């Protein structure tokens, strides 16, 4: 009888070790995957300029298009990422670009800005997109809670 109980105990211990090891590997690879996706996103979509960084929504890097919605998403992604200094610096670069491209007399970002264009369409510079402004505002709230600067 004791042999049987002992074999059940060993079986239970082996199963527990297996479950814990699988869970550990899953958690480690999940965090690694998040960081890998964030790095790929940065390399593919983030364009750095002397006025900060923007999320490029165009297939051209030289004449990239910055939309306020994409800028808001980019700011949110940076805040929600867990790479402390990297994501914080990325957020502030995106924020700096936002500050340089607001509709005159407001705190709202111009809905569309084409980098490298000799002349911007006046309609693009005088109008904003509410959804982009809401994403930016939400990202600013989260950033103030996370980094308190």
Which residue stretches match the model-derived regions?
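Well-ordered alpha-helical scaffold segments within catalytic/enzyme domains
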Residues: 70-86, 135-148
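Low-complexity, Ser/Thr/Pro/Gly-enriched N-terminal "stalk/linker" regions
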Residues: 6-8, 15-69, 80, 85-115, ...
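Positively charged n-region of N-terminal signal peptides that target proteins for export
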Residues: 1-5
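Aromatic- and histidine-enriched alpha-helix N-cap/loop-to-helix transition segments
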Residues: 62-73, 127-135
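Extended ligand-binding groove/face enriched in aromatic
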Residues: 99-149
């Amino acid at each position: 009888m004791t042999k049987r109980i002992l074999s059940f105990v060993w079986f239970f211990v082996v199963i527990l070790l297996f479950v814990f090891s699988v869970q550990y590997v899953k958690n480690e690879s999940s965090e690694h995957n998040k960081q890998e996706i964030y790095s790929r996103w940065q390399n593919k979509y983030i364009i750095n300029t002397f006025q900060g960084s923007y999320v490029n929504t165009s297939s051209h890097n030289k004449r990239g298009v910055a939309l306020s919605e994409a800028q808001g998403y980019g700011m949110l992604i940076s805040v929600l990422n867990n790479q402390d200094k990297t994501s914080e610096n990325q957020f502030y670069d995106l924020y700096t670009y936002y500050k340089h491209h607001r509709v005159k007399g407001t705190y709202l970002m111009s809905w569309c800005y084409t980098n490298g264009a000799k002349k911007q369409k006046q309609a693009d510079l005088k109008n904003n997109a509410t959804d982009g402004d809401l994403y930016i505002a939400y990202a600013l709230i989260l950033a103030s809670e996370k980094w308190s600067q």
